[in-house]
Amino acid sequence: MANIHQENEEMEQPVQNGEEDRPLGGGEGHQPERNHRRGQARRLAPNFRWVIPNRQVNDGMGGEGDDMEIFMEEMREIRRKLRELQLRNCLRILMGELSNHHDHHDEFCLMP
């Protein structure tokens, strides 16, 4: 009898980790959580901004047009450098074949 009374007291104690009591049966529109950690991650989701670098957080504060323009310019620069490297590689292979007459079947050239 004392054990039952002690168990009831343990069940009535407030939760100390900051979680509130939820009914086990669910309710309207409530889907039971399959995993406690998943539910915890869901509660933490709105506080994700600390993970994002400052540049990206500041993008949402009104400077989106300028940042998009900078991003597009960076992408154009990357594409230009990639084309230049591919062309240089192709020219090296072709010039080497013309002068050496060696077989370069293992090398390839990506032309844009």
Swiss-Prot record:
Record region (Interaction with 14-3-3 epsilon): 69-112
GO terms under cellular component: cytoplasm; cytosol; nucleus
Keyword match Glycosyltransferase: no
Location of the motif Nuclear export signal: 78-88
Region (His cluster): 101-105
Keyword vocabulary terms for this entry: Apoptosis, Cytoplasm, Metal-binding, Nucleus, Ubl conjugation, Zinc
Chief location bin: nucleus
Family: Belongs to the BEX family.
Protein name: Protein BEX3
Organism of provenance: Bos taurus
